[in-house]
Amino acid sequence: MRQGGEGQCISAELPLMRQAMTRAQRPPAEEAPPLALGIPVHGRWTARNGPATKVPSHTHNLAQTYAIDLARRPAPEPVWLWPPARRPETYPSFGEPLLAPADGQVVTATDGQRDHLTRTSLAGLLYVLPEAFVRSIGLPRHLLGNHLILDLGDGAYAVLAHLRRRSLKVAVGDRVTAGQPLAECGNSGNSAEPHLHFQLMSGPDVTSAHGLRFTWRYQDGDGREHQGVPADNTCVVPVPNAPKDPPASYAP
C-alpha cells in the first residue's frame, strides 16, 4: 500500500489480483534487444509494477511480462475506512492525454466500458479481489478495460489500457505518428485508481502474444537523465526529442 509522499504509490493491480488473473502462464519470447520508444504521456508521473523491479512485472499471462503502470502524482491518499471509494475525476491521472509511443497503425480500439469508482480503501480492497477473479474468467477486455493496440511494425505491438470511456481520438486502421494524442487516461477494467497500463508484445492478440522489452528516455525526480525502464516508485518525466534507435525485429 502507498505511504505518504509523491514517490510512494498504492499498486493499481495488487499481487493477489494478479494471481487471480493468471491462468496459463506464457513464457516470454526469445530475448531480443529492447525497442526504444517514446513515453506515451506528458509531465511528471510515477512508475510502478515495472520490469526494472521484477520480471514478470505483472504476469506472463496476456503478454504482460514487461508491462509497466504509470500514475500521475500527487494523488489522494488511500484511506482505510472513509470514503470507501472516490470518483476517478479526483485523481490527476484521469483525463490526461495519452500519446503514440512510435509511428504505427491502430489494430484494436475500444472505449465503451465505464470508468468505475476507485478501490483504494479497505472496503475497496475487499471488493476488488473477487471482482478481479470474475474479470479474469471473462474476456481480456474485462481486465484491460478500454484499450488500444498499435502495430509498430517488425512484429512489435503496443498496448495502452484502462483508457477513459469515450475518449478515443483514433479508430481501427488509422495510421498514427509518434507523440500523436490517442485517448485519455481512465479507470476502466482491472484498475484500482486511474493510471496507464503499457506493454509491448509480439502479436496483436494478447492471449497468444509474448511480452517484449522496451526502453524509454526520461528524467527522474532529481533531473538525472536515463535510457531504460524506471524502477517502481521512480519519478518519470519524458525527455522530448529522444533520438530514434533503429527498430529491432521481433518477428519469428
Stretches found by the model and what they are:
Residues P33-L35, H58, P140, L168, ...:
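Acidic, glycine-rich catalytic/binding loops that coordinate metals and/or anionic ligands
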Residues N49, R72, T108, H162-R165, ...:
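A residue-level detector for short acidic-glycine micro-motifs
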Residues T53, P76, G112-R114, P181-S191:
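Short, charged beta-turn/beta-strand-edge "cap" motif at the junction between a beta-strand
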Residues P92-F94, L143-L144, L168-K169:
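Short, small/polar residue-rich loop motifs at catalytic or cofactor-binding pockets
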Residues L98-T108, K169-E184:
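Short, well-structured beta-strand-loop connectors
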